[in-house]
């Protein structure tokens, strides 16, 4: 049976890429597309929004009215909207691919609670390459982490509203966990003025916002006399969209639980 997917935030940059990815993938189809209430895009054809021509699927604003048209929601929007979508999924037995970043601790707790009743993949980044980088960072941290200064540099387009990026924070979490550190204690998110000497246990973050940068992340493991850099650069949002569709196919066989792309890609067995 073909898996039917719904895209929320269908008119956004990521939403349009997701529509394209769904249409190009095998075994799935676009069941519904949504925008926020009052959007000028309500009633527009989802295919035309994505540059694919008419698909006969009109952008809607009420998930409940369209709930019989899809099995899984893909959500790359903003925390306040995503929390409402999570409630909908729990109440209506729908599964969720969640790519929204910028959740506070309460939001993350709500996601975990919802996963006790439905199946959710929650990842800061759906790129296969980035998730491979997470594993490489763990390996590098084991070898060099206690003897080097660790810095994470990320760059994104001017429209991104949260900083550091969710991916950069995930990188920091993977490193901190490997080293037995707490990112809330050891993370350094800004430097200005007289900061004093750097602590060896610091995990530093630097953020760039400029033009149309899709997403770039570089992690330094810097020791005296040498530096190892692990980088990932995305040139198209399609890498994230294709990963999200891949995650949706994988999630179709799950009933409840909170998963990430490590589970989807079976990276724990590397």
From Swiss-Prot:
Subcellular localization, per the record? Answer: Cytoplasm
Q: Which Enzyme Commission number(s) are on file for it?
A: 1.17.1.8
- Residue ranges that the Swiss-Prot or TrEMBL entry lists as coiled coil: none
Q: Where does (S)-2,3,4,5-tetrahydrodipicolinate bind?
A: 157, 166-167
GO biological process per UniProt: diaminopimelate biosynthetic process; lysine biosynthetic process via diaminopimelate
Source species, please? Mannheimia succiniciproducens (strain KCTC 0769BP / MBEL55E)
Identify the stretch annotated as signal peptide in this record. none
Q: Does the keyword Amino-acid biosynthesis apply?
A: yes
Q: What does this protein do?
A: Catalyzes the conversion of 4-hydroxy-tetrahydrodipicolinate (HTPA) to tetrahydrodipicolinate.
Catalytic residues in the record = 156, 160
This protein's pathway reads:
Amino-acid biosynthesis; L-lysine biosynthesis via DAP pathway; (S)-tetrahydrodipicolinate from L-aspartate: step 4/4
Q: What is its main location?
A: cytoplasm
Do you know which SUPFAM superfamilies this protein is assigned to? Glyceraldehyde-3-phosphate dehydrogenase-like, C-terminal domain (SSF55347), NAD(P)-binding Rossmann-fold domains (SSF51735)
Could you list this entry's UniProt keywords, alphabetically sorted: Amino-acid biosynthesis, Cytoplasm, Diaminopimelate biosynthesis, Lysine biosynthesis, NAD, NADP, Oxidoreductase
What's its catalytic activity?
(S)-2,3,4,5-tetrahydrodipicolinate + NAD(+) + H2O = (2S,4S)-4-hydroxy-2,3,4,5-tetrahydrodipicolinate + NADH + H(+); (S)-2,3,4,5-tetrahydrodipicolinate + NADP(+) + H2O = (2S,4S)-4-hydroxy-2,3,4,5-tetrahydrodipicolinate + NADPH + H(+)
Stated name of the protein = 4-hydroxy-tetrahydrodipicolinate reductase
Q: What Gene Ontology cellular-component terms does the record carry?
A: cytosol
């Amino acid at each position: 049976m073909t898996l039917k997917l719904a895209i929320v935030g269908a008119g956004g940059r990521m939403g349009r890429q997701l529509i394209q990815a769904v249409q190009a993938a095998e075994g799935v189809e676009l069941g519904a597309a949504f925008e926020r209430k009052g959007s000028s895009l309500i009633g527009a054809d989802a295919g035309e929004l994505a540059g694919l021509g008419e698909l006969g699927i009109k952008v809607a604003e009420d998930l409940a009215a369209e709930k019989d048209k899809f099995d899984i929601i893909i959500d790359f929007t903003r925390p306040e909207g995503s929390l409402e979508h999570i409630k909908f999924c729990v109440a209506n037995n729908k599964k969720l691919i969640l790519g929204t970043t910028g959740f506070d601790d309460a939001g993350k707790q709500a996601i975990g609670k919802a996963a006790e009743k439905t199946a959710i993949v929650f990842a800061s980044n759906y790129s296969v390459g980035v998730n491979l980088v997470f594993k490489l960072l763990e390996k590098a941290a084991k070898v060099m982490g206690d003897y080097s200064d660790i810095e994470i540099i990320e760059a994104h387009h001017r429209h991104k509203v949260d900083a550091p990026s969710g991916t950069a924070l995930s990188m920091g979490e993977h490193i901190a966990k490997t080293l037995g550190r707490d990112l809330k204690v050891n993370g350094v998110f800004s430097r200005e003025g007289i900061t004093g000497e750097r602590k060896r246990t610091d995990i530093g973050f630097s953020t760039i916002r400029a033009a149309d940068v899709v997403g770039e992340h570089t992690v330094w493991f810097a020791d005296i006399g040498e530096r190892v850099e692990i980088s990932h650069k995305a040139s198209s949002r399609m890498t994230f969209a294709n990963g999200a569709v891949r995650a949706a196919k994988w999630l179709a066989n799950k009933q409840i639980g909170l998963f990430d792309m490590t589970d989807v890609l079976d990276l724990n067995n590397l």
